[in-house]
Each structure stands twice: as C-alpha cells, then as structure tokens.
C-alpha cells in the first residue's frame, strides 16, 4: 500500500490573502498518485516538464503544447472519428485548442478578479447538486470551443461559496466521463481529492 501525500497550492488571490473573499487552490499530484489514478508511464503529463506543476497551471501549459495535442488527437482518434466531431482534422483540433486556451485562462482570471467564481462552476452531477446546500461538492466548468463544440472542462471541489480546489481538467471527447481514458483519469483525480478534502 502506497501512502500518498496530495499537495495543495494557492493560485488565487496572488499575494496577500488577508482581505480576500474568494480562494482558488490547485492540487499538485505526485507521479505515484497519478499512476494510481490510471495514467501510464510515458504520458506527457508525467514528464519532467509537467510533473512539478499544479493541475491548473499544468492545464494551461498542456493546452498550448502542440506536441501534447498531437499525441492527444492520435490517442483519441476513435472518438474524433465519431459523427459528433464532424470529421475534425488533427490540424483543426490543434489550432482550435491552442487558440482557445489563452482566452479560457484569461476569462478565468478575469472572473477571479471580479469575484464571480460561483458563476463558472456547476455541480458535476445530480448527486452533487443534491448535496450542495450542505457540504463540499464536486464541480465542473465548461469553456472554449473545438470545431463548434464546448469541449474544455476544469474540475474542482467547491468547499464553500468562493472557495475552490482545482483537481484537473480535460478536453472532453465523449458525453460520459467514464467512456474515455482522459476523463476517467480526471474523475479518479476528482474523487481522490474529494475523499481527502470533502
């Protein structure tokens, strides 16, 4: 049995938190934790370039990395060949992601600054919605477009109004999270952090 030690870092507000009424934290999983959640040796997210990044900043970098996006497209080709994606090409996919990413993160930071965090997150599912008034819940946000589809997700735990812990994010390629490897891993990360925090 491996003893994990999930680390959490503050990403907002930057600097003095004395008068802040909103907080965004982000999980920094270590390699063993990520492997236990379904990642495979050799995946880009486990490389030296990304392993020391918290989940929020890792997403920002991954969604701008053409090599990662090329691999992502190839690894998920069966999903992109579905009618839902309208025969999207790899070039179009990479272009849409790399052009959307800066706008997504700029919008998120603007919402942080404007105190509108609660407007961008919604309960992950019915179960979380039912628990919302009483306890911490799992949440998601939806941003950006790929081939006219809202496909970017950021997952978090809502501790209370204005306080979130980001556990990861994904380019969602299918409707249900458990149907694709990347979103299954994100669900595992979210559930693991929720069990530790919630």
Regions found by a protein language model. Name each.
Residues 2-151, 173-198:
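Basic, Lys/Arg-enriched alpha-helical interface segments
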Residues 158-166:
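Active-site beta-strand-loop-beta-strand hairpin of nuclease catalytic cores
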Residues 165-168, 175-176:
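Short conserved catalytic/interaction loops centered on acidic-Pro-aromatic/His motifs
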Residues 153-156:
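Short acidic loop-to-beta-strand element that houses the catalytic metal-binding Asp/Glu
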